[in-house]
Each structure stands twice: as C-alpha cells, then as structure tokens.
C-alpha cells in the first residue's frame, strides 16, 4: 500500500489537530476447541490462547509507536459462551467469565467480549444459561462484555429473551450494564464491544479494526465551506476515505506481524466524550443548530451515505457495524442536547433508521418500571427487523429520576436519564413467545 506525500501530511494533521485515532484493534479468536463437559478441562484448554493474546498486545503497541498513531483500546472477541454452556452447568459460566477477565487483565486487554448468546427464535440450554448468569458474570468482572441477539430479519423477535434481559440489567450497576446489549442482526466480525464475538464462518483468528474520526469530518466541512449538498457530500466522502485508509494500514500491519488474517475495517464514526470528537457536532456543523431539530435525520442520512461510499473506496474489507454511532453518553454534544430536551427516545429511534446505533448508552429510571423498558427495546429491535439492519439497545437502569445524570468518566462519559412515556404497556408486554419474522423474510429467498 503506497501513500503520497500530500496524503501523509493530511493524515499527520488529522492525528495531531483533529483527534483522529484508532478506536480499537480487536483480535477475534476461535475458542470452540476448548469446549468440554468438564470445566477444568475447558479452562486448561483456554490457557492456550494466553501467549497469543500476549503477542497481540505487544504488537499493537509496537504498531502504534511505529506510525505515531494513538490506538485507544485493545480488544479481544471470543466464540460465544453459549456454546460452552450447552454442555457445562449454569454456574460454570461465572467461572468462565472470571477466567476471561483475568486473562484480559494479564495481557493489558481493555475488553474481552463474547459472553453472548443467540436467542432470536427461542432458547437452547446454552443461551438461557447465558441470560440467567449475565448479572453475576458482569458484576464479578471488569473487562468482560457480551450481547444477546434477540431478533433477526430471518427469525423474528424473542420477547421472552427481552424480558429476561431487562430483569438482569436492573440488577447490575451502571458500569456493568454498559458492557452488555441486546441486538438484532448482529454481525460476526464487529470490532466494537459489546457486540464483538468470534462469529460463525470466521477464520481461526483475525484482526478487525474500528476507526474514530468525527473531528476530521467536522474540520473538513468547516475548512471547505460547501455551497451545495453535493459539495457537502463529496467533502465528507473524501475525509472518510482518508480515515478508512489509516484503519486499513494499522489493521493489515498488525495482522501481518501476527501471521493471521485481516478481515474488517468498521467504517463507523465513533465519538468520545472529548470536545471536538462528536458525531452530533458534525450534524450541527452541517447546519442544524441543535441536533434533534427538524432536518437532523436528513443530515445524518447524508453523512452516512458519504462515509460508506468513501470508506468502501478505501478498503475492500468493510465489515462490522459500519455506520455512525450516536451513543448518548459517549458523545459530549449528544449528552448536552439530551439534558436540554432536544433528544428523546423517539428521536433516537428515528435517527437509528439511517445509522446503526439504536438506543445506545442511555439511562432509564428504575422508578418507571420494567414494562416500559421492554416496550422500548422491542421498538428498536422491530425497526432492525423491518429494515434488515444491525440495531441494538444498551440501556443503563439508574435509581435517579428522569432528567438527572451520572458521570462514569473515560470513554463512557455522562449517562443522561431520559424520561420514558407515562403510558401503561403492561398488557402488551405480558404476551409470551416471539414475534414472527416479517414479510421482509420472503425477500431473502
């Protein structure tokens, strides 16, 4: 891969003045070889990946130093724990969780993801055991993450899985609930937690990369002062191309040094609580005074289309979620607009129709009850099914009332407690079973 002198200078400016970084380099590794009906045997087999994780951590640090690029997090995704718990006892899931947490800490891995299950049409022993142990698994670890895929365009939506999930997250503190999500159509190669897991059909081990560049897009728009929407689209597209090329360079270098496959650059624009690193701020730079105002959806649609076209030109290894993230707490401007009243749950659902964020990193007051949260999650997963999109809900139940917030610090930012509608939905949420797949399923063959 060759780079022109002009391109190198531009990237240098992006790195030093516009907060461009690599959000995550994620090692995705098959761990199914360690499945056994004896916990001790499983743990002993899993020990084989320790040296691999140690090499990965060292190589990522070396690549970051070599290119002068800030790599924010090192992450690992493993095969879904559901498959281990098909043959192990329920309580063994906690021991697996604690072991994965220890091995991540030992090797300076920020997150290890894969305490996950697929239950979009019903439960197996393993998927139900993951759900039942989710509270303890997260409460007894610090780096473990995982998700429940409770809906898909192919299969429909498992309402019973949503109910159990809500019961579990109401029992865990905010920091722990930030490490789990419930999703529709989850991809097999996401570099982001908590959706990351080593999916079916993936190679034995592979590298997936997530980039972060909202500040770069914002600066490009401000510099260029576009006069037409076509010019605006083109500016974003060109900036996205350069951001993606950086992700490709880092991912391929790490993979080559490890002697494994490079699979995915996730094109998602991932914000952070830092000033100047906000997706919402891009929308406001495009001309919407406050995100949430009318026109926000159209502006986000332009942003998404341009990012995807620019990114797809820069790499043939597109994967993961590849859209914009608008996690409320992790985006400083989104958080402020939520407190000001410009962003509510239905605004987030509307914006999710053109991006892959869903309801992400938003607080709900426990005092408003579980039924409304179940209804909210079913809304966002239904949108994912109907549009055949990757969507999810990462909701943070909090004891505080709507309108308040708590600050988790770091990448997690300020959790705003949004008000749920004061409407009784208990009759609807009392139904059991699953919502059948839609007519969209017939379009897939």
UniProtKB/Swiss-Prot annotation:
InterPro entries: UPF0210
Entry-linked CDD domains: RNR_PFL_like_DUF711
SUPFAM superfamilies: PFL-like glycyl radical enzymes (SSF51998)
HAMAP family xref list: UPF0210
NCBIfam families in the record: PRK05313.1 (NF003700)
Family statement drawn from the similarity comment of this UniProt entry: Belongs to the UPF0210 family.
UniProt protein name: UPF0210 protein STK_02450
Organism: Sulfurisphaera tokodaii (strain DSM 16993 / JCM 10545 / NBRC 100140 / 7) (Sulfolobus tokodaii)
């Amino acid at each position: 891969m060759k780079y022109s002198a002009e391109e190198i200078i531009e990237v240098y400016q992006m790195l030093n003045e516009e907060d461009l970084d690599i959000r995550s380099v994620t090692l995705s590794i098959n761990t199914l070889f360690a499945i056994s009906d004896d916990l001790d045997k499983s743990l002993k087999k899993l020990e084989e990946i320790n040296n691999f994780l140690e090499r990965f951590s060292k190589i990522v640090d070396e690549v970051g130093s070599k290119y002068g690029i800030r790599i924010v997090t090192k992450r690992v995704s493993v095969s879904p724990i559901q498959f281990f718990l098909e043959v192990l006892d329920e309580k063994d899931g906690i021991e697996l969780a604690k072991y994965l947490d220890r091995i991540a800490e030992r090797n300076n891995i920020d997150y290890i993801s894969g305490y996950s299950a697929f239950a979009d049409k019903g439960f197996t022993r393993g998927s139900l055991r993951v759900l039942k142990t989710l509270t303890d698994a997260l409460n007894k670890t610090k780096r473990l993450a995982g998700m429940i895929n409770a809906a898909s365009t192919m299969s429909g939506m498992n309402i019973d899985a949503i109910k159990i999930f809500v019961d579990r997250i109401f029992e865990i503190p905010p920091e722990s609930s930030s490490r789990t999500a419930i999703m529709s159509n989850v991809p097999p190669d996401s570099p982001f937690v908590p959706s990351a897991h080593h999916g079916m059909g993936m190679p034995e081990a592979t590298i997936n990369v997530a980039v972060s560049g909202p500040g770069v897009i914002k600066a490009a728009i401000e510099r260029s002062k576009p006069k037409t929407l076509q010019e605006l689209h083109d500016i974003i597209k060109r900036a996205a191309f350069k951001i993606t090329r950086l992700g490709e360079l880092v991912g391929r270098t790490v993979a080559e040094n490890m002697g494994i496959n490079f699979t995915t650059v996730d094109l998602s624009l991932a914000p952070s609580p830092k000033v100047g690193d906000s997706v919402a701020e891009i929308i406001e730079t495009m001309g919407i005074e406050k995100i949430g105002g009318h026109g926000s959806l159209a502006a986000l649609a332009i942003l998404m289309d341009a990012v995807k076209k620019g990114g797809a030109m820069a790499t043939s290894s597109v994967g993961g979620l590849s859209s914009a993230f608008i996690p409320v707490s992790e985006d400083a401007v989104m958080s402020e607009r939520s407190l000001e009243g410009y962003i509510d749950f239905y605004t987030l659902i509307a914006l999710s129709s053109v991006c892959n964020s869903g309801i992400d990193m938003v607080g709900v007051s426990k005092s408003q009850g579980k039924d409304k949260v179940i209804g909210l999650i079913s809304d966002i997963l239904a949108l994912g099914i109907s549009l055949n999109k990757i969507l999810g809900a990462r909701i943070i139940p909090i004891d505080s009332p709507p309108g308040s917030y708590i600050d988790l610090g770091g990448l997690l930012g300020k959790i705003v407690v949004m008000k749920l509608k004061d409407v009784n939905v208990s009759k609807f949420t009392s139904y059991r079973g699953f919502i059948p797949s839609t007519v969209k399923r017939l379009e897939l063959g």
